[in-house]
Curated annotation (Swiss-Prot):
Gene from which this protein is expressed: rbcS
GO biological processes: reductive pentose-phosphate cycle
InterPro entries: RuBisCO_ssu, RuBisCO_ssu_dom, RuBisCO_ssu_sf
Compartments in which it is found: Plastid, Chloroplast
Name of the protein this chain belongs to: Ribulose bisphosphate carboxylase small subunit
Ranges in coiled-coil conformation: none
Keyword check for Metal-binding: no
Cellular component terms per the entry's GO annotation: chloroplast
Recorded family membership: Belongs to the RuBisCO small chain family.
Further details from the record: In this alga, in contrast to plants, the small subunit is encoded in the chloroplast. The basic functional RuBisCO is composed of a large chain homodimer in a 'head-to-tail' conformation. In form I RuBisCO this homodimer is arranged in a barrel-like tetramer with the small subunits forming a tetrameric 'cap' on each end of the 'barrel'.
Gene Ontology molecular-function annotations: ribulose-bisphosphate carboxylase activity
PANTHER family (alphabetical): RIBULOSE BISPHOSPHATE CARBOXYLASE SMALL CHAIN 1, CHLOROPLASTIC (PTHR31262), RIBULOSE BISPHOSPHATE CARBOXYLASE SMALL SUBUNIT (PTHR31262:SF23)
Organism of origin: Trieres chinensis
Subunit structure: Heterohexadecamer of 8 large and 8 small subunits.
Length: 139
């Protein structure tokens, strides 16, 4: 199962050249970049681990790509995404986010159904890799 989160999620994986073009676009807009990673990309897990420091005043594509390559070396078996943050007044939010690296095997999710009193049913989305492995050893 291929995880689909963020921009470009239904397209094939971006090449480094395509990632550089997206970084250039973000820098031209004046947005700050950062790199995040996780080994639990559950749809409701919006708090991924920040890689290094946010790249606030970086205007060089090569510097951002260096941080990405270092994250890929260290977190090769997890998901890595890039975020762009617009600090302008009135926005002050993440305006672009896309996955740049993923594990070779993505086990997917399953739906767990729990029946309660009076035909009350709750559903929970759970990840196969989390069910079988502890944090840090999921891929």
């Amino acid at each position: 199962m291929r995880l689909t989160q963020g921009c470009f999620s239904f397209l094939p994986d971006l090449t480094d050249q395509q990632i550089e073009k997206q970084i250039a676009y973000c820098i031209d807009k004046g947005w700050a970049m950062n790199v995040e990673w996780t080994d639990d990309p559950h749809p409701r897990n919006s708090y991924w681990e920040l890689w290094g420091l946010p790249l606030f005043d970086i205007k060089d594509i090569a510097s951002v790509m260096f941080e990405l390559s270092e994250a890929r070396k260290s977190c090769a078996n997890g998901y890595i995404r890039m975020n762009a943050f617009d600090a302008s007044y009135g926005t002050e939010s993440c305006v672009m986010s896309f996955i740049v690296s993923r594990p070779s095997n993505e086990p997917g999710f399953y739906l767990e159904r729990t029946e309660g009193a009076g035909r009350f049913i709750t559903y929970t989305i759970k990840r196969y890799s989390v069910q079988a492995n502890a944090e840090g050893s999921r891929y």
